[in-house]
Amino acid sequence: MAHLEITHDLDDEGLKRVSSPRADLVRETDAGNGEFALIDGPFTLYKRTLTIVSEPGRHLVKEQFEYELSIPWFGFLFRLPIRHALRNRRDDGTAPFWAPPDHLGQRATTIFATLCAIALLSGFLSNAPSETHTYAADEFKVDQLSQGLLGALIRIGTLLAIGFAVLADRHGRRRILGWAMGFGIAFSCMAALSPSIQIFAACLVVVRTSNATLGVIMVVFALEELPAGSRAWGLSVLGLSAALGAGLVVWTQPVAGFAEWSWRLIFFIPVLMVPLIFGAIRQLPESRKIGRAVSRNA
């Protein structure tokens, strides 16, 4: 639980302003007795309390915030910006420049932050085969024609992902996301242990299928959960997250040059993201669309 305390020396107009519910980063409702509760905003818990000592024409106001962010995985990046936004109230109803155009509630914030974390894994799985298959070809002693065929074969996984996207409509986004992450990480590790180019190629087909499945379901999930005015913003942030994951492959690529076999180490990196699977399954609710479909069929 985070705490923030601000002391104001205000005139009557300033007191009226600070005593009204906020409608910027957070939307409040007046709970009475100088307390304001959360209507909408990126918080699991939120309360604003005013303590007022008045004199003729002047008011000493102690404003206290108690809150807990509903931003998993990336919450530490937003601690200071959110404290700054709470300290500097906006009366025009707009959010800070770094926030989405629409107000995101606890559910949407939690879902979107988790999807961004999954996008890191998706970006890594997408770029790892492209950046390392030449190193694998050198170790397995295959020619350039075989490398080209390998690259074409791997991309079959993108087509296979269509079937898994259909399964997500029937069995839920959350479940298929979990399976796709699990298979992507497992077969990335199997690719690292491949004894031949054929097994390596087969593993990468599964990795590509898992990654494409993640990409499709993440986009659909985000579009279903984000407000209409924030969907373009959301897709842009998901793209940035995936690019960061892809960049991780490039940053670690020098490892592949240490020895003929050292490219394999890059494919073990997704093991570090295993906690993401359990966290995503625990924190992600099912999408509203699937939830409504289940309710109708019940």
Predicted regions and their residues:
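Extracytoplasmic
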Residues: 111-144
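Helix-breaking motifs and short loop linkers at transmembrane-helix boundaries and internal kinks
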Residues: 141, 172, 193-198, 210, ...
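Cytoplasmic helix-loop-helix junction between adjacent transmembrane helices
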Residues: 203-240
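Glycine-rich segments within core transmembrane alpha-helices of 12-TM secondary carriers
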Residues: 230-258, 273
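Symmetry-related core transmembrane helices of the 12-TM Major Facilitator Superfamily/SLC fold
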Residues: 263-282
